[in-house]
């Protein structure tokens, strides 16, 4: 099997392709590397001006080495093999969007550090319990959540009450699974 691509190699390729210097760039796309990236190594710390980083469609297992990315607002890690959210604390003060769908995340420990997170796309992961889902209530800015394809969502959607149950637990959401959240208090008063 081919050796994994390192972040350093991927950045060299990206610089050649775009003609930009990685340490000056505000948006860096390292998605779908062949062979795939397996580790978020220390080379990431050179991306001091990066606001949008895409590492999706690789084989990354752990979030790491984000400490130099003082301006990071959008992090895309979809379609990897990430099992937990450890490592995000380095960007907890700046990150506004985390795209982490199609991974292996079961527990949301560590999400509470994301004080500015507005958008969380984490469909098709392995979250099974309300106890984990409730950790999202620690995110004061979260307004847009995609959670479809997690065992918890699938179970409650099958019963027809996912949206109601999820929005009851996260009342500040404006969008859930791509749909605007409609508050239902007014509608239920006239029903018997």
Swiss-Prot record:
Family, similarity comment: Belongs to the dynein light chain LC1-type family.
Lineage of the species this protein comes from: Eukaryota, Metazoa, Chordata, Craniata, Vertebrata
Keyword terms: Cell projection, Cytoplasm, Cytoskeleton, Dynein, Leucine-rich repeat, Microtubule, Motor protein, Repeat
Name of the protein: Dynein axonemal light chain 1
Biological processes per GO annotation: outer dynein arm assembly
UniProt KW Isomerase keyword: no
Extra remark beyond the main annotation: Outer (ODAs) and inner (IDAs) dynein arms contain the molecular motors that generate the force to move cilia by ATP-dependent reactions. There are two mechanosensory systems that monitor and respond to the mechanical state (curvature) of the axoneme. One system involves the central pair microtubule complex and radial spokes and the second system involves the outer dynein arms.
Subcellular location: Cytoplasm, Cytoskeleton, Cilium axoneme
Main location: cytoplasm
Top-rank lineage group of the source organism: Eukaryota
GO molecular function, one term: dynein heavy chain binding
Residue ranges constituting the LRRCT domain according to the UniProt record: 150-192
GO cellular component, as recorded: cell projection; cytoplasm; dynein complex; microtubule
Positions annotated as LRR repeat: 49-70, 71-92, 94-115, 116-137
Species this protein is from: Danio rerio
Functional note: Part of the multisubunit axonemal ATPase complexes that generate the force for cilia motility and govern beat frequency. Component of the outer arm dynein (ODA). May be involved in a mechanosensory feedback mechanism controlling ODA activity based on external conformational cues by tethering the outer arm dynein heavy chain (DNAH5) to the microtubule within the axoneme.
Subunit relationships: Interacts with DNAH5, a outer arm dynein heavy chain. Interacts with tubulin located within the A-tubule of the outer doublets in a ATP-independent manner.
């Amino acid at each position: 099997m081919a050796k994994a691509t390192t972040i350093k190699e991927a950045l060299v390729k990206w610089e050649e392709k775009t003609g930009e210097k990685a340490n000056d760039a505000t948006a860096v796309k390292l998605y779908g590397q062949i062979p795939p990236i397996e580790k978020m190594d220390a080379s990431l710390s050179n991306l001091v001006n990066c606001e949008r980083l895409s590492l999706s469609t690789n084989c990354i297992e752990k979030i790491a080495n984000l400490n130099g990315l003082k301006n990071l607002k959008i992090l895309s890690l979809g379609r990897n093999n990430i099992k937990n959210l450890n490592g995000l604390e380095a960007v907890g003060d700046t990150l506004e969007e985390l795209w982490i769908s199609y991974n292996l995340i079961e527990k949301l420990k560590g999400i509470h550090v994301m004080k500015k997170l507005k958008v969380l796309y984490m469909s098709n992961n392995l979250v099974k319990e309300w106890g984990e889902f409730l950790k999202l209530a620690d995110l004061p800015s979260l307004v847009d959540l995609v959670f479809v394809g997690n065992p918890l969502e699938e179970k409650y959607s099958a019963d027809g009450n996912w949206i109601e149950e999820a929005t009851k637990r996260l009342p500040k959401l404006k969008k859930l699974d791509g749909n605007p959240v409609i508050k239902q208090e007014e509608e239920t008063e006239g029903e018997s």
